[in-house]
């Protein structure tokens, strides 16, 4: 009795997995629009319904298996089939909802175009301009974020160079003090240090000005 039940379960399970694969391939074709969406969607829906029916049969069969280890194994397989069928069913429903929305939008657009060059065409032009404006805002935002990141990287580079320069200057001054060079040489080094500092700040200010002008330009 147990072997017969397991054998029947194996056949039902194999059939369910085969139909699941066919339904999954059908949904992938729907996403690519390789076939007629209406007929293919109906075929996929029938496959999912058939798998759900087979899953109910499996649920009744595995409960009659006396050996607990085998019963638990087939329970998990039955649950797996049910979960896959539910996932495909949700995917199909999402596709059908998106497809219906696209068809509705296309119909509304056609209705607006059908009104000629009057109010409908004007409304359609407004929609197109708003869509272009949103795309322009997204592009400007992305460019601004890229420019900001570049500015931050430049400022970080300046800060890193400043720290390295200060460390090198301290070491140089220590060496100069050790060998006893003249005060004129030390003043020359300090003057060069001030010039480098001004160059650094000028670069930072120029970067901020460029960012400000870019923000004003994108608005």
Curated annotation (Swiss-Prot):
Keywords of the record: Acetylation, Golgi apparatus, Membrane, Protein transport, Transmembrane, Transmembrane helix, Transport
GO biological process, alphabetically ordered: protein transport; regulation of innate immune response; regulation of protein secretion; vesicle-mediated transport
GO CC terms, sorted: cis-Golgi network; Golgi membrane
SUPFAM superfamilies: SNARE fusion complex (SSF58038)
Transmembrane segments annotated in the record for this chain: 198-215
Top-rank taxon: Eukaryota
Topology versus the membrane: Single-pass type IV membrane protein
InterPro entries: GOSR2/Membrin/Bos1
CDD domains for the chain: SNARE_GS27
GO molecular function annotations of the record: SNAP receptor activity
Cellular localisation: Golgi apparatus membrane
Modified residues (N-acetylalanine): 2
Vesicular face residues: 216-219
Function: Involved in transport of proteins from the cis/medial-Golgi to the trans-Golgi network.
Family membership noted in the UniProt record: Belongs to the GOSR2 family.
Protein name per its UniProtKB record: Membrin-12
